Swiss-Prot record:
PROSITE patterns: PROTEASOME_BETA_2 (PS51476). One of its GO terms (cellular component) is proteasome core complex. Pfam families: Proteasome. It is found in: Cytoplasm. HAMAP family: HslV. It comes from the Bacteria. It comes from Aliarcobacter butzleri (strain RM4018) (Arcobacter butzleri). The active site is at residue 5. It catalyses: ATP-dependent cleavage of peptide bonds with broad specificity. This is ATP-dependent protease subunit HslV.
Amino acid sequence: MFDATTILAYKGKNKAVIGGDGQVTFGNTVLKGNATKIRTLYKDQILAGFAGSTADAFNLFDMFEGHLEACKGDLLKSVIAFSKEWRKDKVLRRLEAMMIVLNKEKIFILSGNGDVVEPEDGAIASIGSGGNFAISAARALAKHSSLDEEELVKESLMIAGELCIYTNQNIKILKLED
């Protein structure tokens, strides 16, 4: 259940975009095909998406939003404060969820054990069972196509939906623009 979804984020030149599929599974059963796993945070200045347990993810969203408020929307400071709290709390360390958070300047993956990872290229991140398919497609499309950020995320998630049985093609997208 921890990885059964796909979230892809792309921080381009003109937009920051996050997208996710809508499939919710329990074991080998599809429970829902149109779930929303992405949202905006802190005055619509931060994009976030989750993979993993829905209940755990909502708790993490609430906690992270508290850190964003305390840090006045500073994404880097919020991520560091959130990670410190996550690692110190025994209950949090057992939560089965991962998050991607981004704004127009930075992008981070928050792992299930409290690690913070900034993608090597600083532009593309993915989580979930179809994450490797989506990020591979996104990197190829970024390098060899003229798709804008939103189209690139959608097309990459559609490709992941063709390959990953835990990912569908009911794609939702959120973006931040200049």
